Amino acid sequence: MKNINPTQTAAWQALQKHFDEMKDVTIADLFAKDGDRFSKFSATFDDQMLVDYSKNRITEETLAKLQDLAKECDLAGAIKSMFSGEKINRTENRAVLHVALRNRSNTPILVDGKDVMPEVNAVLEKMKTFSEAIISGEWKGYTGKAITDVVNIGIGGSDLGPYMVTEALRPYKNHLNMHFVSNVDGTHIAEVLKKVNPETTLFLVASKTFTTQETMTNAHSARDWFLKAAGDEKHVAKHFAALSTNAKAVGEFGIDTANMFEFWDWVGGRYSLWSAIGLSIVLSIGFDNFVELLSGAHAMDKHFSTTPAEKNLPVLLALIGIWYNNFFGAETEAILPYDQYMHRFAAYFQQGNMESNGKYVDRNGKVVDYQTGPIIWGEPGTNGQHAFYQLIHQGTKMVPCDFIAPAITHNPLSDHHQKLLSNFFAQTEALAFGKSREVVEQEYRDQGKDPATLDYVVPFKVFEGNRPTNSILLREITPFSLGALIALYEHKIFTQGVILNIFTFDQWGVELGKQLANRILPELKDDKEISSHDSSTNGLINRYKAWRG
């Protein structure tokens, strides 16, 4: 990939001038001038997804200039580099090929001259065989009983993705109860173990190296708990499987390496749900539905890699995000799914975006002089409306929002879904167009309010509007449509990383805290007063020691 400071491009300079012309233009003005704005600024994908980006502070000229920026930064070349297996994660010297994991067309994808697809397909087949044995009840625990509960032990990408997907696709789940443990806080594993029976529980230990501190601490606690009931260590093999590449450590733990599911160093953690890390998804919804999830993502991969940039949905969303982040100074983006099953979607892409593009050094190793990744946050609608929408509507910060909803619900209870969707539509309308002083005054006059009350209250009731949103309407949340939606956001993040000239697929920012924690841990073993750190850290450690007794 090319190393280009985006601010030094002609397109960026043109965008800066264009911003000066656009900064006072309102969304209401744009709609008033163009009755066809929706049709010009929306697109469908596979008759499964409608993306409406018309309620943004953009014009056709804005998008054209943003497309020029993408061209100058050689986005097309970067896309080809990723899909062809080039080692675009240069700081770790790795290819980035989560797209190979869902390559349902099975066309060869090469890394170091070797086609990775045979190995990908072999692991998928192994996942299929294993999951069918568990789901059918053919696989028995140490007392001859079938498995009823699955506990996935992992953290970061080994937890967030599988947990999000199994929750989002709960309407497709089978009889197995799914549990997820991530936090090294013993409370997390303790509370899960209260709910399960050692005779009928399968643990999935998800750690590529089988050395991740949080995961292995929880795995050993689960093993100890299991052996208190089972007694004989040989029974571990019937109740534990590994998602790892460290066969030696897996075997030493007591897991049969036949039940070790591999993945590769070209699979990044936050893009790993498509790999063996997704075994918990397979066990929850069945292999056929998992294949549908892969197929939806693959369809979006094809769209992203073959569609011209001006009609390319991940590219459009990425460019609009850069427009707000770098020109309007918007520091955050909210992801607001109007579907309770999607309640972990924002948390998943909090990691997906912030761990990918939360970088202050460019691909040349230079400190950047522009904004990189935004802060990502969000909650399901309508809960968020009663929590933080106040700030989005009337606060002093611009918060671009993505609203996501299915047209068809899995739970058609009376008029619940119509009420939910009426809020979905109303919020984007309110954010875009607001409520003027004149309208508020007329409402108060119609209510017979006296002029003094009217003059005092009116300013508090005015909504400026002009708050930007994207609306993503899905026909229904299915494995296919969810796969496509996840891939849409993945490729948006990649596109932004390319243009912002940063390495999206490493995560060195997680390392320093881990190193320091490993240094501090031995200091917590005794009651000696600590003086080896700064005064704040010393004070905190010493108060902890005093209070723990």
From Swiss-Prot:
Organism in which the protein naturally occurs: Escherichia coli O1:K1 / APEC
Superkingdom assignment: Bacteria
UniProt KW keywords: Acetylation, Cytoplasm, Gluconeogenesis, Glycolysis, Isomerase
One GO CC term, this protein: cytosol
Record-listed E.C. numbers: 5.3.1.9
Keyword presence, Isomerase: yes
Record-linked Pfam families: PGI
Catalytic machinery residues: E355, H386, K514
Primary site of residence: cytoplasm
UniProt protein name: Glucose-6-phosphate isomerase
Role played: Catalyzes the reversible isomerization of glucose-6-phosphate to fructose-6-phosphate.
NCBIfam families, A to Z: PRK00179.1
Record Gene3D superfamilies: 1.10.1390.10, Glucose-6-phosphate isomerase like protein, domain 1 (3.40.50.10490)
Catalytic activity: alpha-D-glucose 6-phosphate = beta-D-fructose 6-phosphate
Pathway participation: Carbohydrate biosynthesis; gluconeogenesis; Carbohydrate degradation; glycolysis; D-glyceraldehyde 3-phosphate and glycerone phosphate from D-glucose: step 2/4
Residues annotated with N6-acetyllysine modification: K80, K228, K234
UniProt-annotated location(s): Cytoplasm
Any GO BP annotation: glucose 6-phosphate metabolic process
Enzyme category, top tier: isomerase
Membership in a protein family: Belongs to the GPI family.
Keyword Cytoplasm assigned: yes
SUPFAM superfamilies associated with the record: SIS domain
GO molecular function: carbohydrate derivative binding; glucose-6-phosphate isomerase activity; monosaccharide binding
